[in-house]
C-alpha cells in the first residue's frame, strides 16, 4: 500500500533529575554538597533511509518517545545522556509542524537528517545551590521536560520527470515502455491509483527518473476525483511531460484537455507552471490523430497560462513510434533545469511590537472554587522542582512570588485555605 501523508506525535526525552547528596569522606569534615547533575534527554531525529518507499509503517505506530537522561549521582557524578531516537523515513519526505504548518525539514538527500524534538537538559544537583548563607543546600532540580509536538509527514516522490494528463491518455503505457516499471494498465479510468516510478536509461549513458502520476480531472485541485492528494508529487519534478490523447475517442478535444489540466496545476500551485513542459501527443497510431494534432497546434497559439509555448512530440506509446527523440529532448531539458526548492508557507516579514510582556502564567478558577495556575513557563518551573525536598519547594514558592503569582491570587480574591493547583500538584493558599 502506498501511503504518502501521515500525522504522528513525537516526544523527546526528559532531562535526568539532579541529586541531593553530600560528601562523606574520612578526615574530611563538613564535606559539603556533592549531588551530580542529570543527563540530557534524547532527541527525536528523522533520517533518510534509501530503502523505504512509502510512509506505510507510520500507519501502525503513531507515537514516538525518546528515552530520558540518567539521574545525577553521588560524588558530583553527572547522569548518562540518553541516546537519540532515530526514525527512518523515505527520501523526499517533508516534515511539518501539524499546528502551524511550518516546515521543520525537507529530507531530499541520502544523508539528510533533522531534529524534530529536542531532549530536555538535565536538572542541576545541589552542588550548584551552595552559598555562604546555605553551604549545605537540600535543593536539586528535576530534569527539563523534553519537547513534544504533533508533526505531519508528507512524501513527495523524487522524480526528475512527471507524467500528467487525464485518465487513460497512456501515461502508464509510456512508463512501462521506456522503463522497466510495471504499472497496472487497463481499459478504464483511474487504473493508476498510486505514483509509479521508473528509471529511463538512454544509449548515450544519460538517465533520469520518471513518475507516472494518477490521472487528473477537472476540479482535482478542489478535491474532485482522486483530488489533489497526488498533485504534491509534481512539486519535486523538474520537467513535466503533459500527455494528451490525440484520438479524440473520449469525446474531448485535445486542447480542452491541455487547458483543463494546466488550470488544475495552476489552481494547486501557480509555480508548477514555471517548470518546463513538453506536450506528448499520444496515440498517433489512431485514425483521426493526425488531423486532431494539426488543430491542436492551431489552438495552442491562444494559450496564456504557460510562459512559453511548449514543444510538441507526436508519439505512440503502444507502437513505440517517436519515443527516442522525446526522451533525448527530455534529457537535454533536465540538464538545463535546476532543482526547485521546497515551497515554504508564507509568513509575515514585519513584526509589530506593542511593548507588552508576555504573561508568565495564567490564573483561572474552576467550578468548585479551586484556583488553576498554568502557563508554559510556570508549569516548566514546577516540573523541574523536586517536591520531595522542602528547600526545593520553598525555592519554587520564591520563584512564584517573584513572577507575581501571590499578588495575582490576592487581587482575584483568593482566601486563606483556598486550594491552588499547578499541573497535578495541589496546595493550600496562605495569604
UniProtKB/Swiss-Prot annotation:
Its EC number is 3.6.5.-. GO terms for biological process: ribosome biogenesis. It is found in: Cytoplasm. Residues 125-145 are annotated as: Disordered. Residues 353-431 form the OCT domain. GO terms for cellular component: cytoplasm. It is an enzyme of class 3 (hydrolase). One of its GO terms (molecular function) is GTP binding. Mg(2+) binds at residues 172, 192. GTP binds at residues 165-172, 190-194, 212-215, 282-285, 316-318. It comes from the Bacteria. Residues 1-158 form the Obg domain. InterPro entries: G_OBG (IPR031167), GTP-bd (IPR006073), GTP-bd_Obg/CgtA (IPR014100), GTP-bd_prot_GTP1/OBG_C_sf (IPR036346), GTP1-OBG_CS (IPR006074), GTP1_OBG_dom (IPR006169), GTP1_OBG_dom_sf (IPR036726), OBG_GTPase (IPR045086). Gene3D superfamilies: GTP-binding protein OBG, C-terminal domain (3.30.300.350), GTP1/OBG domain (2.70.210.12), P-loop containing nucleotide triphosphate hydrolases (3.40.50.300). Monomer. An essential GTPase which binds GTP, GDP and possibly (p)ppGpp with moderate affinity, with high nucleotide exchange rates and a fairly low GTP hydrolysis rate. Plays a role in control of the cell cycle, stress response, ribosome biogenesis and in those bacteria that undergo differentiation, in morphogenesis control. PANTHER family: DEVELOPMENTALLY REGULATED GTP-BINDING PROTEIN-RELATED (PTHR11702), MITOCHONDRIAL RIBOSOME-ASSOCIATED GTPASE 2 (PTHR11702:SF31). This is GTPase Obg. It comes from Levilactobacillus brevis (strain ATCC 367 / BCRC 12310 / CIP 105137 / JCM 1170 / LMG 11437 / NCIMB 947 / NCTC 947) (Lactobacillus brevis).
Amino acid at each position: 500500500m502506498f501511503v504518502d501523508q501521515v500525522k504522528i506525535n513525537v516526544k523527546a526525552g526528559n532531562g535526568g533529575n539532579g541529586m541531593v547528596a553530600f560528601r562523606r569522606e574520612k578526615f574530611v569534615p563538613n564535606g559539603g554538597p556533592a549531588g551530580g547533575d542529570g543527563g540530557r534527554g534524547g532527541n527525536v531525529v528523522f533520517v533518510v533511509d534509501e530503502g523505504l518507499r512509502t510512509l506505510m509503517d507510520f500507519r501502525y505506530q503513531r507515537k514516538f518517545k525518546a528515552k530520558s537522561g540518567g539521574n545525577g549521582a553521588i560524588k558530583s557524578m553527572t547522569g548518562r545522556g540518553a541516546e537519540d531516537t532515530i526514525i527512518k523515513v523515505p527520501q523526499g519526505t517533508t516534515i511539518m509542524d501539524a499546528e502551524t504548518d511550518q516546515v521543520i525539514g525537507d529530507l531530499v538527500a541520502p544523508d539528510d537528517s533533522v531534529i524534530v524534538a529536542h531532549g530536555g537538559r538535565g536538572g542541576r544537583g545541589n552542588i550548584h545551590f551552595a552559598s555562604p548563607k546555605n553551604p549545605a543546600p537540600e535543593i536539586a532540580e528535576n530534569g527539563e521536560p523534553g519537547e513534544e509536538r504533533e508533526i505531519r509527514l508528507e512524501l513527495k516522490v523524487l522524480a526528475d520527470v512527471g507524467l500528467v494528463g487525464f485518465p487513460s491518455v497512456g501515461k502508464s503505457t509510456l512508463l512501462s515502455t521506456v522503463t522497466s516499471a510495471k504499472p497496472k494498465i487497463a481499459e478504464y479510468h483511474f487504473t493508476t491509483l498510486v505514483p509509479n516510478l521508473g528509471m529511463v536509461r538512454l544509449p548515450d549513458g544519460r538517465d533520469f527518473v520518471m513518475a507516472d502520476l494518477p490521472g487528473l480531472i477537472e476540479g482535482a485541485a478542489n478535491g474532485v476525483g482522486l483530488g489533489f492528494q497526488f498533485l504534491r508529487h509534481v512539486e519535486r519534478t523538474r520537467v513535466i511531460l503533459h500527455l494528451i490523447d490525440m484520438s479524440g475517442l473520449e469525446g474531448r478535444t485535445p486542447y480542452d484537455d491541455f487547458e483543463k489540466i494546466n488550470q488544475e496545476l495552476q489552481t494547486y500551485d501557480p509555480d508548477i507552471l514555471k517548470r518546463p513542459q513538453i506536450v506528448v501527443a499520444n496515440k498517433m497510431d489512431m485514425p483521426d490523430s493526425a488531423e486532431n494534432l494539426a488543430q491542436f497546434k492551431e489552438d495552442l497559439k491562444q494559450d496564456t497560462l504557460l510562459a512559453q509555448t511548449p514543444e510538441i512530440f507526436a508519439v505512440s506509446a503502444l507502437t513505440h513510434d517517436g519515443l527516442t527523440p522525446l526522451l533525448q529532448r527530455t534529457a537535454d531539458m533536465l540538464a538545463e533545469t535546476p532543482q526547485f526548492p521546497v515551497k515554504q508557507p508564507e509568513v509575515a516579514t514585519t513584526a509589530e511590537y506593542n511593548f507588552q510582556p508576555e504573561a508568565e502564567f495564567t490564573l483561572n478558577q474552576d467550578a468548585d472554587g479551586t484556583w488553576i495556575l498554568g502557563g508554559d513557563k510556570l508549569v516548566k518551573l514546577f516540573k523541574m522542582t523536586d517536591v520531595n525536598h522542602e528547600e526545593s519547594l520553598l525555592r519554587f514558592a520564591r520563584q512564584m512570588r517573584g513572577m507575581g503569582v501571590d499578588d495575582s491570587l490576592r487581587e482575584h480574591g483568593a482566601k486563606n485555605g483556598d486550594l491552588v493547583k499547578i499541573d497535578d500538584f495541589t496546595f493550600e493558599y496562605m495569604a
